[in-house]
């Protein structure tokens, strides 16, 4: 409503109580009643430059917050560790040979491991990203960031099962990969 009012140059009212606005030879009907007593004037719009945002960092921060409250030093009841709740098997599969203490006390290792996992999953899931990105599957708008977040939660194998057979995976807390596809979809990430 407010943005419409900010662009009104002159107003008039018709018999049926519809407000008419005329701006640069363009007439717009606004279905508002009871506005006859308002004295509307044109307000010049102010343009503000919005800085470019780092979509990768926003994506990582969002996943980190969901997984651990963005805490690097936390271990959950299933033994998953750090900001992104890595399992020992995932770290080993990525080639990391660190102790739990080394991992929990090194934000640098955790961030590098997350980027390595995202790159690994993207490589394994590129066919599905190419095929389904922008499509609605089982009611979910599919995006690259959503697929990669789902793979982080449930593994790339479970993401493939979802696309091949519609099979839903949930982790030990009952969180589904489709909830991650929705929650973390739409980020413009560069992995």
How does the language model describe each region?
Residues 96-145, 153-160:
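Alpha-helical segment that forms one wall of the substrate-binding/catalytic cleft
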Residues 54-71, 114, 148-155:
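Short, functionally critical alpha-helical segments immediately adjacent to catalytic or ligand/cofactor-binding
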Residues 137-191:
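Catalytic and substrate-binding regions of cell-wall glycan-acting enzymes that process beta-1,4-linked
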Residues 49-57, 76-84, 103-111, 141-145, ...:
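Solvent-exposed, acidic/flexible segments
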